[in-house]
Structure formats: C-alpha cells, structure tokens
C-alpha cells in the first residue's frame, strides 16, 4: 500500500510539471505572436519599397506558424487537464467470509428468455389493523434480460430477494396514524351529503308535492327534491263528460280527492290531478283532461295500483250509527 501511494504521488507531481511546461510554452508562443503582430502593424503604416513588402509577407507567414504552434500548445494543456482526476480507485474493506455452507454457495440465478418489463405493482397482502407493523405490502421489480429480481418489502422492515434466501435488515419508519384513516369532511362536503340524504328522503312524494305546492297548490313551500319520477303503470281511458264544469268528473269505484291542476299547452282546458282518498296512504293517482278534438269527452289516465279493494271505503270511514227511535208516551 505504501508503494502504491508513493507511485501515485510521483505520478501526480509529473502531471503537474508537464501541465506547467505546456502552459509556459503556450504563453511564450502568445508573447512572440503579439510582438510579431506589433512589428507588422508598425511596418504597414509607413510606406516601404519592394524588398520591404517581401519582408512583410514573410512576417505574415511567420505569424501564422506561431499562431498554429501556440494553439497546439494550449490544446495540449487542455487535454492534460481533462486527463487528471480520472482512473482512480479505492480499495474497500475486506469482507469477512461466513463459515456457513449456505452463505458460501451462491443462489442460482434464473435467466429469462427475453427482456420482459413488468410495471411496478403494490400488493397489500395484510389487513391494516394497527397502522404499524401489520400493514404489509410487496413491490415487484422490473425483470432484466439476464436475470429477474423480485424484492419484497414487508411491514417489519426486512428486505428479501423474493427467492427465500437471506435477507438484509432495513428498518423503515412506521407510517403516520392518519395515513390509513379517512380525512375529515369539510363543511361543503358535509352540506352536500346532507342534501343527498334530504333528496333521498323526500323522493317518494316528489310527484304529488310538486304539483300541490306549485302555482295551483294550496301549500306555500316547494319541495327541492329531485324531479325524477318512478316508473308507474299508466292506463288511459276515454269517458263522456257529465257537464261543462271542469270539476265534474264521472264517478268510479273509488273515492278521489283533487290536489292540483295545471294548464295544457295548446288546449283551453286545464288538467286536474287526483289522488285516491279511499284508504290513507294509497299510491294510486289519476289526472283528467278534456279531449282537445272533442270537448265532450274526457281523457282519464290512471297511475299506480290501489293497495285495497273498493269495499275498503266503508272500513276506513264507518257509517254513522242510526238515530235512536222515539218511544210513544203512555
């Protein structure tokens, strides 16, 4: 080691001396060139005979040669400076070999037939119960042309080569406790979720309440829930009108209560909306309108199904008891 250090020291000294000599030669050439150019400029200002002109041409040729030589010297300096600092190496500490037979024999390397690149994937194999060591994930590496390497990073901080061999310990910092939990909702998100719940709650009465609370309704507030209606079975019939009044409609097997009406585009007659009042909570509806082509006919459209029979009217509203009989006085 001492011999190598001395040789390397002598080599560095030789390099520095060579660089200094090349730089000095370049500077001397530049100084000579400047003097030659100054003499040439002085001779050009004063008129000279023919022999003097030949001397000036010779001086120009000498200037070109000096310039080329100076440039070559500086190029040599640059190349020597570029070579310094390279091709150096250090010897690392000698690693003590293990006496175990498993460590002396290297694990076989499986070669892949072609270069197949696999994307990086994260596989969360364990449930995150304690936000700490139980949260495990594996990272799949990119397989090269000669060998494939699979590194798995487990939650306890050990890095293995994926083939069941020895593993080198790598302690990883535990993740923060808030990384696996849900972030707190902002006020806007909370208001939005509350609005969704309100829409879901009052969707069932959207059809009836929108009409009753609208322009022709009796209530003052309008429901702000979704206007989407459920798919209902519709049945349309045509019956003759019993009078010219809009409120007079033909009777059927059920009792109906009017809860709203609205005008029809292109028709002078409005459309009336009725709900079944035979039994409380019955979803059956109907709307009645006059036929624009024949005002003496009514178009009745039924929606929904009754949840009772026509005889339920008497059960929901029992008849009043008969008045007591008057007994004759004796």
Swiss-Prot record:
Region (Disordered): 39-61, 91-117, 302-330
SMART domains, A to Z: WRKY
Known function: Transcription factor. Interacts, when in complex with WRKY71, specifically with the W box (5'-(T)TGAC[CT]-3'), a frequently occurring elicitor-responsive cis-acting element. Represses specifically gibberellic acid (GA)-induced promoters in aleurone cells, probably by interfering with GAM1.
Tissues expressing this chain: Highly expressed in aleurone cells. In seeds, predominantly present in the plumule, radicle and scutellum of the embryo.
Source superkingdom: Eukaryota
Matching InterPro entries: WRKY_dom (IPR003657), WRKY_dom_sf (IPR036576), WRKY_plant (IPR044810), Zn-cluster-dom (IPR018872)
One term of GO molecular function: sequence-specific DNA binding
Pro residues composition-biased segments: 318-330
Motif Nuclear localization signal positions after renumbering to this chain: 74-81
Induction note: Induced by abscisic acid (ABA) in aleurone cells. Accumulates in response to uniconazole, a gibberellic acid (GA) biosynthesis inhibitor. Repressed by GA.
Cited SUPFAM superfamilies: WRKY DNA-binding domain (SSF118290)
Keywords: DNA-binding, Nucleus, Transcription, Transcription regulation
Protein name: WRKY transcription factor WRKY51
